[in-house]
């Protein structure tokens, strides 16, 4: 079966409707979906252009969080398959509350300040990626630790982009693991440390794609590093998440809850 192109249309960043679309589409694992986010569709010209783009795309679906009915109409009038967050949810909420909804143009999260906070968190995650700028670790909400390629960077960026959390990440190198002690840069920050680990075979496959045939990518090397890292984290009572069968969304949700 051919896949579907899924357009996530929003009058702001598109993060909310993209998350909704991913959650819904995950219920259909046998079908392939390609997500395209169309953010900041906040006037008629942009809505017409976006609807036109979708209309010429084969097997297209639209998930929309447009708050303005006039903008939503461009997609409906084009005869597209539209799944609209506000059109389906808001009327039900209005009936319960006895209060009409007021379109807020993307301010569903207090967006102006919230958006700035998320972008600041993303910049922080990039500045403190892979052990960079350890002198600023004290500013982090969470510090992700683990051996190379266990998913620290994408998880830190997801936490920043979706939750506004300032997440740093710090690699545990073979030299660190040989010392049987936490790297000095991490020692003052124990309450904020969170460990990530993987099945050795999964880690080896990820590393093999980066450095084929290397010792770094061997299952034996991966198992040795992971075992040493897990012992080190356990010795310091640092919470550890096995990400082998988890999506980055699930990992981030677990970390946020912690």
UniProtKB/Swiss-Prot annotation:
InterPro entries: Kinase-pyrophosphorylase, PSRP
The protein's name: Putative phosphoenolpyruvate synthase regulatory protein
Keyword Transferase belongs to the record: yes
Keyword Transferase: yes
Keywords tagged on the record: Kinase, Nucleotide-binding, Serine/threonine-protein kinase, Transferase
Family: Belongs to the pyruvate, phosphate/water dikinase regulatory protein family. PSRP subfamily.
PANTHER family to which the protein is assigned, alphabetical: PYRUVATE, PHOSPHATE DIKINASE REGULATORY PROTEIN 1, CHLOROPLASTIC
